[in-house]
């Protein structure tokens, strides 16, 4: 048999490294906030981009005289009203957090934002889809001269835009919640 060398492990004592001057006073390293998260400028812009189309959708739908004729349109008004109130309240919270330079990366806060975004986005999408179906039906039946088809289409489109703007907020909050 050949004499083959075998690796040997020799433990080496690691000497402790003394902290340098000022390292103790330095705050711990924190990851940067991802833009779009609560308490960031991107989050503030996302909340504003959710609020404005939702407010336009509610305003356009409520100014029509016959939106109560279909349950889907009433549902759209309720869902988008909830979306606009939710987005406005979170816009105010984000603006306050930016003004006082406070982080909103608390687990409970992110969980509340995630659940709220999930509920409001689901309601808005469902109501916008139902309203789109009723609007297409009214168009196909040739009843646009009696109804306000253009207003219904505008309100439905604004609801979809508002839902589309809520999606990044929900995904970022959910991601933050999952990695927290």
Curated annotation (Swiss-Prot):
- For the Cytoplasmic compartment, the record's topological domain ranges are 1-41, 94-117, 178-180
Q: Is Disulfide bond found in the keyword set?
A: no
Q: Which GO terms describe its cellular component?
A: plasma membrane
* Subcellular location per the Swiss-Prot or TrEMBL entry: Cell membrane
Keywords associated with the record:
Cell membrane, Membrane, Transmembrane, Transmembrane helix
This protein's membrane topology, according to the annotation, is:
Multi-pass membrane protein
Instruction: Give a single Pfam family match.
Output: CASP_dom
Family from the record: Belongs to the Casparian strip membrane proteins (CASP) family.
Describe its partners and assembly state: Homodimer and heterodimers.
Instruction: Write the protein's name.
Output: CASP-like protein 5A1
- What is the scientific name of the source organism? Arabidopsis thaliana (Mouse-ear cress)
């Amino acid at each position: 048999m050949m004499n083959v060398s075998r690796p040997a492990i020799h433990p080496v004592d690691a000497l402790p490294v003394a902290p340098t001057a000022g390292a103790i006073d330095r705050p711990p390293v924190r990851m940067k906030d991802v833009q779009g998260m609560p308490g960031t400028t991107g989050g503030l812009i996302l909340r504003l981009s959710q609020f404005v189309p939702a407010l336009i959708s509610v305003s356009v739908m409520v100014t029509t005289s016959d939106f109560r004729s279909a349950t889907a349109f009433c549902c759209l008004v309720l869902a988008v009203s909830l979306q606009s109130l939710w987005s406005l309240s979170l816009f105010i919270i984000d603006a306050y957090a930016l003004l006082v330079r406070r982080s909103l990366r608390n687990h409970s806060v992110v969980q509340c934002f995630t659940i709220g975004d999930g509920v409001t986005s689901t309601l808005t999408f469902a109501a916008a889809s139902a309203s789109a179906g009723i609007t297409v039906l009214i168009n196909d039946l040739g009843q646009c001269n009696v109804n306000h088809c253009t207003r219904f289409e505008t309100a439905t489109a604004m609801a979809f835009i508002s839902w589309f703007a809520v999606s990044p907020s929900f995904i970022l909050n959910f991601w933050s919640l999952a990695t927290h």
